[in-house]
């Protein structure tokens, strides 16, 4: 009887502490049409049953607002309840629409109650707002952003709203580029959040040597820089990926083979170890953007475009994950910004022409441009010492390349534009152990889980 209880306890620890693994989901399709609840349900079901995987059961959203409405909760919420898919919520903080985002959050809490609350693993307040508000972001028309003071105020407001509700223990974070996180003027945001969201795209680091063979080192370097300023708080990987098709960015070639390599070398070590939201399940419905990051094509199918299986050799060892749990926590991604404006209802981002009830911005880091437009690609810190990358756009606006800025050692992978069907990613990780446990577990506790399992089975061996 004692043995049975010990084994059950060990297994419950392993189950409860598993890292979240999912995709980013925009509020609209690639043609700008608004997604319905059934659309989200189909996507969530497909993600859970992808051939070669154990299932991607979490979804990162860019906005709380359903497309075509002023402040009604996004239909991804009832879809997630129906499909038992966990949620990393996103509130678009720039452009003057925060009041409507907060109204939608309040409505979701009252309308869906505990069935909704139990699925929420985190809340991201804004995405890449700090980058867009920077001088470098303004130079490339990255879109409307906000500074650290306003962002901290919004974070406090969200904490106040969820206090005393079923979401009171949910960790709150913000998603931005590593250059924004490492800019000392933004340190107040790090102090205000429970976790930091990171997005990184080596493919778009076109001012550097960014071939697929360099991708893992570029990604790891940018994550390390973010963790170095995180003050011990978790970094969640909220957005990263490699395109299956599209234009070439310096040495970065979009192809199925390279997307598979990036999945193996960057994704597989993260999955089940670090909270990770990949970019993206599908971005080619009904039109295919340039570049396209979807692991499935224009037709939603559980059969992916390339092999998604992860061999044991691509995963960190149990001892490595336990000893490096703090450094291996996922990093988040950031919200859209770039050359093409998107509608938040579809991607979580909206153009300046869209009412302030939906986020307004253009494609930039961490965001995929709508349709064929590409993001303003992020590269490295500017030569002037600014922590923000410089970008130049092509005349067509369909693609952009970053200007040379900073040495390669100062550069790390960041984000890029995405299709309008997706919105910019946000991410986070709970820093406090209480927050982590409250949300069902995070990568930082993987070491303690492993230790508990070892202790239990060692004890069993003595019986």
Curated annotation (Swiss-Prot):
Residues 441-463 form a propeptide. The keyword Membrane applies. Gene3D superfamilies: Glycosidases. Glucanases play a role in cell expansion during growth, in cell-cell fusion during mating, and in spore release during sporulation. This enzyme may be involved in beta-glucan degradation and also function biosynthetically as a transglycosylase. GO terms for biological process: cell wall organization; polysaccharide catabolic process. Residues 1-18 form the signal peptide. InterPro entries: Beta-glucan_modifiers, Glyco_hydro_17, Glycoside_hydrolase_SF. It is found in: Cell membrane; Secreted, Cell wall. The active site is at residues 128, 239. Residues 317-354, 396-430 are annotated as: Disordered. The GPI-anchor is attached to the protein in the endoplasmic reticulum and serves to target the protein to the cell surface. There, the glucosamine-inositol phospholipid moiety is cleaved off and the GPI-modified mannoprotein is covalently attached via its lipidless GPI glycan remnant to the 1,6-beta-glucan of the outer cell wall layer. GO terms for cellular component: cell surface; extracellular region; fungal-type cell wall; plasma membrane; side of membrane. Keywords: Carbohydrate metabolism, Cell membrane, Cell wall, Cell wall biogenesis/degradation, Glycoprotein, GPI-anchor, Hydrolase, Lipoprotein, Membrane, Polysaccharide degradation, Secreted, Signal. One of its GO terms (molecular function) is glucan endo-1,3-beta-D-glucosidase activity. Pfam families: Glyco_hydro_17. It comes from Aspergillus oryzae (strain ATCC 42149 / RIB 40). This is Probable glucan endo-1,3-beta-glucosidase eglC. Belongs to the glycosyl hydrolase 17 family. It is a lipid-anchor; GPI-anchor. Glycans are attached at residues 84, 183, 312. It catalyses: Hydrolysis of (1->3)-beta-D-glucosidic linkages in (1->3)-beta-D-glucans. A lipid is attached at residue 440 (GPI-anchor amidated glycine). Its EC number is 3.2.1.39.
């Amino acid at each position: 009887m004692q043995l049975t209880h010990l084994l059950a306890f060990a297994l419950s620890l392993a189950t409860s502490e598993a890292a979240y693994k999912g995709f980013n989901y925009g509020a609209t399709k690639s043609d700008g049409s608004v997604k319905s609840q059934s659309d989200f349900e189909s996507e969530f079901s497909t993600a859970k049953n992808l051939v070669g995987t154990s299932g991607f059961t979490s979804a990162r959203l860019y906005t709380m607002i359903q497309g075509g409405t002023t402040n009604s909760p996004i239909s991804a919420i009832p879809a997630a309840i129906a499909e038992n898919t966990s949620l990393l919520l996103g509130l678009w903080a720039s452009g003057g629409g925060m009041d409507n985002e907060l109204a939608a959050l309040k409505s979701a809490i009252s309308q869906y109650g505990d069935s909704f609350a139990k699925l929420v693993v985190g809340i991201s307040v804004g995405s890449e707002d700090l980058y867009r508000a920077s001088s470098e972001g303004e130079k490339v028309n990255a879109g409307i952003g906000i500074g650290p003071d306003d962002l901290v105020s919004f974070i406090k407001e969200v904490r106040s709203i969820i206090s005393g509700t079923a979401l009171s223990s949910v960790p709150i974070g913000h998603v931005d580029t590593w250059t924004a996180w490492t800019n000392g003027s933004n340190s107040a945001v790090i102090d205000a959040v429970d976790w930091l969201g990171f997005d990184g795209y080596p493919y778009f680091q076109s001012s550097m040597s960014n071939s697929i063979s360099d991708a893992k080192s570029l990604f790891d370097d940018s994550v390390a820089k973010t963790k170095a300023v995180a003050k011990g708080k978790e970094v969640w990987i909220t957005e990263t990926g490699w395109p299956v098709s599209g234009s070439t960015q310096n040495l970065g070639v979009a192809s199925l083979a390279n997307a598979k390599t990036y999945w193996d070398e960057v994704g597989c070590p993260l999955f089940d170890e670090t909270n990770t939201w990949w970019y993206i399940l599908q971005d080619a419905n009904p039109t295919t953007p340039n570049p396209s990051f979807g692991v499935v094509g224009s037709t939603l199918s559980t059969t992916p475009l390339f092999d998604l299986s992860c061999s044991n050799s691509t995963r960190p060892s149990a001892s490595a994950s336990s000893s490096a749990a703090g450094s291996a926590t996922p990093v988040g991604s950031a919200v859209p910004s770039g050359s093409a404006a998107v509608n938040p209802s579809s991607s979580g981002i909206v153009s300046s022409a869209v009412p302030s009830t939906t986020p307004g911005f253009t494609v930039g880091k961490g965001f995929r441009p709508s349709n064929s437009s590409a993001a303003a690609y992020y590269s490295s810190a500017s030569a002037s010492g600014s922590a923000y990358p410089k970008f130049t756009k092509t005349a067509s606006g369909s693609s952009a390349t970053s200007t040379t800025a900073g040495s390669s050692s100062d550069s790390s992978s960041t984000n890029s534009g995405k299709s309008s069907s997706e919105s910019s990613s946000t991410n986070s990780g709970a820093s406090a152990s209480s927050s982590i446990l409250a949300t069902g577990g995070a990568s930082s506790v993987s070491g303690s889980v492993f230790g508990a399992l070892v202790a239990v089975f060692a004890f069993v061996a003595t019986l």
